[in-house]
Amino acid sequence: RQMCIRDSVYVVPEQEKPDPDFTTLEYPNPEDPKAFTYALRLAKEVNADIILATDPDADRLGVYSKDTKSGEYKSFTGNMSGMLIAEYLLSQRKEKGLLHENGAFVKTIVSTNLADLIAKEYNLKLIEVLTGFKYIGEQIKFFEQNNTYEYEFGFEESYGCLVGTHARDKDAIVATMALCEAAAYYKTKNMTLWDAMIAMYERYGYCKDGVK
């Protein structure tokens, strides 16, 4: 908490301490806009750049970011936040010469095809797996056992991704760190995360999320 205060990270007072009954909201789901009611109110008071919230077991991450043009806070889908993290991490690794020649980008079959374009941009093998993050975890294990590919990034549309190979499930804590790092990076360019997302669409093409 002291680190948060020092670094100008604001915690919603009403939701700061553990509350097994979740008395401040109907359903602690970061995919539900109602879960951000208190956070959005605080964000407007302190003029926050981004709003981040995880679910109770911290594997899914919900995101809002300010739109520079309108000043409004815009919500991200799981596809959007996943792609924003991927683009930032992969671009930084490429710039520093840290991308593997046999790198792999793993996604579930119901996730955005924008991932295909990003994988192509960074010369990564795009691998699609069945719905469920456990299948992404299985790919990591397969890579390690068979020395086929190096895992670069994996995500699913339901607000989950994994940066690194320390786990075999989605990890919202590390995703939060990655998005905060990305937010700081883009702020040096006078951009918010929402601005960066629009720039991604303009680069790769606009995508519409939908389930059939």
Question: Where are these predicted regions, by residue range?
Answer:
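Short low-complexity, flexible loop/linker segments enriched in glycine and/or proline
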Residues: T23-P28, D67, K141-Q145
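Well-ordered alpha-helical segments embedded in enzymatic catalytic cores
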Residues: A35-A39, I85, Y135
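Phosphate-binding and adjacent anionic-ligand microenvironments
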Residues: K44, A48-I50, T54, G71-K74, ...
